[in-house]
């Protein structure tokens, strides 16, 4: 199976395992009642899905019933008929993001960062600190929603990885690798506190998460970089492009 197909199967399987997921026609909706951010709530089409307009109307209605933006994340090659149907129904492409992956023999060690300590959160206070770094790192204000820390806890207890980076006891970075499926895990939610960026913390934290996942018998770590600069950081520790993911949504009515 090509790597991009593996990645799509991994994402779809995790969505189906999530306790609050919805099935709407040929779609699985990953719904997070405790985390309203759009990146935590999206639909994935079935392999080779060919949705009707009625299927799409039902999908939109399900999102709006749960007070979420109608949105999908998927690799277009897994269901070629879906993107044209979505565009015809008024959806707008947010972006086409590269999908990158790394195998154990490709991982490179980045330069060390002075005084940086990376460890897995163990206490509620540590998970909350990690979630706060992520929340602010992705532009949030105030306190994070409960779902942010919950995602890290689920990863840490389900065979994935969670990590909190500190410098002299101050939380400066956080991220995780999802619960694995058939040896694949997604590195996600990686964030570095604004005052500590451009010091190599992102690369160090990413390499730590990836190496730890390999140590827990994962065979591939994949991710979606946020922009070209972030992609270069991941490329510097051994990640390479394996496909492209479509992020597409319907503007509020």
Task: Report each predicted region and the residues it spans.
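Acyl-donor-binding surface of acyltransferase catalytic domains
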Residues: 50-125, 247-250
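A conserved beta-strand-loop-helix scaffold within acyl/acetyltransferase catalytic domains
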Residues: 143-193
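Conserved beta-hairpin
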Residues: 21-24, 84-92, 160-175
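Short amphipathic alpha-helix that is part of the acyltransferase structural core
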Residues: 1-10, 43-44, 48-50, 97-98, ...
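N-terminal charged segments
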Residues: 1-67, 78-79, 83
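Conserved GNAT acetyl-CoA-binding A-motif
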Residues: 66-75, 213-226
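Conserved active-site alpha-helix within GNAT-family acetyltransferase domains
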Residues: 79-93, 203, 227-244
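Conserved acetyl-CoA-binding loop-helix of GNAT-fold acetyltransferases
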Residues: 53-60, 188-194, 198-215, 236
């Amino acid at each position: 199976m090509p790597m991009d197909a593996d990645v799509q199967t991994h994402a779809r399987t995790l969505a189906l395992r999530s306790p609050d997921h919805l099935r709407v026609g040929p779609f699985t909706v990953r719904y997070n009642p405790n985390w309203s951010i759009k990146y935590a709530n999206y639909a994935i089409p079935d392999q080779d899905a060919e949705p009707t307009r009625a299927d799409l109307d039902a999908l939109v209605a399900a999102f709006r019933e749960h007070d979420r933006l109608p949105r999908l994340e998927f690799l277009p090659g897994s269901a070629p008929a879906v993107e044209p149907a979505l565009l015809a129904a008024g959806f707008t492409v947010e972006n086409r993001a590269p999908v990158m992956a790394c195998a154990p023999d490709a991982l490179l060690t980045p330069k060390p960062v002075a005084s940086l300590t990376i460890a897995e959160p163990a206490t509620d206070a540590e998970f909350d600190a990690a979630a706060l770094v992520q929340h602010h790192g992705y532009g949030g204000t105030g306190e994070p929603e409960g779902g942010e820390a919950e995602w890290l806890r689920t990863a840490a207890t389900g065979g994935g990885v969670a990590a909190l980076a500190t410098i002299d006891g101050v939380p400066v970075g956080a991220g995780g690798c999802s619960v694995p499926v058939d040896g694949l895990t997604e590195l996600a939610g990686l964030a570095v506190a604004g005052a500590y960026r451009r010091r190599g913390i992102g690369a160090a934290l990413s390499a730590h998460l990836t190496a730890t996942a390999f140590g827990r018998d994962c065979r591939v770590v994949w991710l979606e970089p946020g922009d070209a600069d972030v992609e270069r950081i991941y490329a510097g520790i051994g990640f390479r492009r394996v496909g492209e993911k479509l992020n597409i949504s319907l503007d509020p009515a």
